[in-house]
Amino acid sequence: MKIPTNMTMAYHDGDIDTNTSANPHLNDLIAVRYSRRQTLMGGLSAATAAVFGGMLLAGCDEDDPRRAVTVQAGASGATSAGKTVTLTGTVASGSATGVAWAQTGGPAVTLANANTATATFTAPSVAADTTLTFTFTGTSTDGIRSETSTSVTVSPARLDFTAVPKSLADVVAVPAGYSVTVLYRLGDPIATGVGAYANDGSDTNFARRAGDHHDGMSYFGLAATGSTPDANGNTRGLLVLNHENITQAYLHPNGATSTGGAIGAGGVRPESEALKEMECHGVSVIEISRSATAWSYVPASALNRRITPLTPMSFSGPVRGNALLRTRYSTDGTAGRGTINNCANGTMPWHTYLTNEENWAGYFRRQFGDVAARGGSTAKQNVSLARYGIRETANATTFNGNYGWASVVPADSANTLYARWNVTTTAATDATGDFRNEAFQYGWVVEIDPFDPASTPRKRTALGRMNHEGCEIGRTIAGVKPAFYMGDDAQNEYIYKFVSATPWSAADATATNRLAIGDKYLDSGTLYVAKLNADGSGQWLPLVFGQGPLTSANTTYPFADQADVLINARLAGDVLGATKMDRPEWTAVNPATGEMYCTLTNNSSRTAANVDASNPRAYTDPKKTGGQTTGNANGHVIRLRETGDTSEATAFTWDIYAFGAGSDLDATNINLSGLDATNDFSSPDGLWFGLPSNPTGNVTPVMWIETDDGAYTDVTNCMLLAAIPGRVGDGGTRAVTSTLGGTSNTVTTRIGKAPATTLRRFLVGPKECEITGIHSTPDGRSLFVNIQHPGENGGPTNITSSWPANQAGAVATPSRPRSSTIVITKNDGGIIGL
């Protein structure tokens, strides 16, 4: 209002107009303010939420039309967890010396470029729709501030890509908007002075080249020091990966050779070929980095390393020094040579890598007469060797183990690298005179420090001996003993859990003596085996000497001590009554809930007569090309919830997350999960959850399923699927009738909620491959995947795949295929899958 001037009394309170400047009145400011508009200048795309628009003034003097600025900052927008959100502000009038974005509400996010007009952030993980609020501020040349607010509503994470169709093409296919880079191939050199790979069978020196059959894999961020971990390193790191096996035919100019007979039937292998084949097994440690355009590996890095069946090993834990580990090479049973058939893996929070020895038994030769030499068929060692599949040959047969390495006659007669594959008793004295105990040196979990090339890998015997597929640690909670979950990958074998004797301490995640931390958590604890009941409950049965039937009085196998129990974990599981499963493969733990998932890849020996609640299907899966697969042909994924959600629990509940099946198979008894053309799969194998350092591992994590299949390959090559699973018990019970071989049997199983659109196909691989091994950078924006044995059914004169040479386009002439690691990135830089 105007101040009155017609005062009639002598009183003077000083309230008179002495301001003769040209500055505006309040009415002028109001007029200025209400002449402006709030506008929305953008929206949401599939990958990015962009918020623009309206304005709000912080104070009336900020509307000074000569000195103030007017800013616009956006109306409400919406997005989902993991998406990149762009906030765009504008200066609608006036001149600003600075602008800034700030968050004022909701779960805290990190604003990139907050002191510019355009700021970005990654939408956080949420369990329900959640609103975040932000303020955009502009400051005039006279220091007057103007600000306005906007909001973004974030919904829970969802898969946001179009499912990749099934395919028989010889190429890696990914969704639109994603790119594939081939990173690390069989034969790639990893040291200075090693030549490029010729890929014609002539190459040697695989101790300094990439091995074959890339499998389980972990990424470790590398700090600027070049030798220490960086848990947040997204552009430089160490990639550690297994080389499970070989495609023998492609490693030599004209395939593998032998003299005096066929390989595996008395033929003698050349030493040079056998050495190459051995060196192609094992593990790679390589440094990788990301430039502005792509990922590549660093061929001359000092951290590059191959670990092979020739690498010195150390034993740790309860079996170290046991008589059954003593050999001609290690007379005190504390050391060994090499690791082999390394399948899945484990990534430890103290930055070490666990590699796991799977199908190791087939590499050994055991000649006729060895059973008698060890005391007859009922002698303990013979019972043990038979239970692990190491049987003597028939009288008229000479089997030299997988690839015939035991047949090699080395140029150096003192060289025992090949003789050790013969576990026949030959010495007149004890086991230190031959390699009768060499098989007991395999079947273990092996821990590697990737940051120390001089370190000796340690075989962790407290985790038991079996066909170790993988070893996945559960959630680590301060003061709680961590658990490590494992599958024994063979038909009708068991699921195991090791609970450390030591409660978790968060400080150990940054310790510099990494293998010593492994000693702390992995050398002492309790190994358990799973028993699953028909009512959906289950128990972890302890493999502890002296408890229950695990004593020297046991008639199946008289256990001598705890070391004997661990060496013979399968026999211990037998007498405890563990549940036989349909080939337990990879394990993975949901980082948000702690629930453990395990792939049961398939089981050709499952019959209608022996189905049970946790392995409820036996059926015929016909092939379009003729023939059929029987048993549990397509496999399933089971999951367990620990009682009290604690890793220390000895009881659990379970259900089956999803059943593999073709979408065209019987929906009542086979395709129980209601799979369709976007997500039907067969033989689940690799399994991994996104990391909790990004939205794929928080609140509603993304689970990745890889396949290793033979039943559905008439329809599609192997694949990678993404899923956002629920929780144990989110479905119900289901009666399932199996009909096979003239027998029918009905059991009631527990099945999770049908996945529908929360499960979809993300990748299809090239011909004759397995999709296996998966990990990501901490930010979830680069996904590493292994393509194993493409073209495995061919050979030098019959090349059945040219991948990866043809990934960028057709090749003029066929190229020998190479197992390889690929990197998948999103073209807009976003988080993979979301």
List the predicted regions and their residue ranges.
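N-terminal secretory signal peptides
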Residues: M1-Q38, S45-M55
